[in-house]
Amino acid sequence: MNCLIVDDDELGRELIAEYLNGQASFDMAVNGREAVEKYKASCASGTPYDLIILDILMPEMNGHEAAKTIRRMEQEQGVTPDKGVNIIVLSALNTPKDIIETYVSAQSSAHLVKPVTREKLLLTLNKLGMISEEC
C-alpha cells in the first residue's frame, strides 16, 4: 500500500507513520497544497497513492480543500468516486455534527477523531479493505 500522510504537526505525521510501519510505504506532506502536489506527482509517475491520511486543520490549504481538489482531479481523469484514492480525514472535532460535516465536506472514505490510536487506524484500514490483518 502506497500512502501519503498529511499533517502540519510533525509528531502527528511520525505517529501515523509508526502505526503504518510494515503495512505501507509512505510519503509525508505538511499542508494541503503540498499534498495535492505530491498526489499529482504520484499519478504522473504511474504509482498513485492508495491512501491519503489527511488532517483537516492545516495552514496554506486545509484538508477540506485538498480533498476537494484531489476529488476534482480524479473526476477530470474519469475516475469514479468508488475507484478514487481512499482518503481518511483526521480531526480534533468530535461532536456527531462536526464528524458528519467533516466527512461529507472532505469527500472522505473515513474519518478518525484525534488522538488516533494504532488500533483505530488499523480497524479503519481493515473496513476499507486495505488490510486484512486483525488489530
Where do the model's predicted regions map?
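Hydrophobic/aromatic residues positioned on beta-strands within the core alpha/beta folds
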Residues: 90-91
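Active-site beta3 strand of CheY-like receiver
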Residues: 43-53
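Receiver (REC) domain active-site loop signature in two-component systems and cognate sites
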Residues: 58, 70
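Conserved sequence signature across two-component system core domains
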Residues: 6-7, 29, 52
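Two-component/phosphorelay signaling modules centered on CheY-like receiver
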Residues: 10-28, 106
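Alpha4 helix (beta4-alpha4-beta5 surface) of REC/receiver domains from two-component response regulators
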Residues: 65, 77, 82-85, 94-110, ...
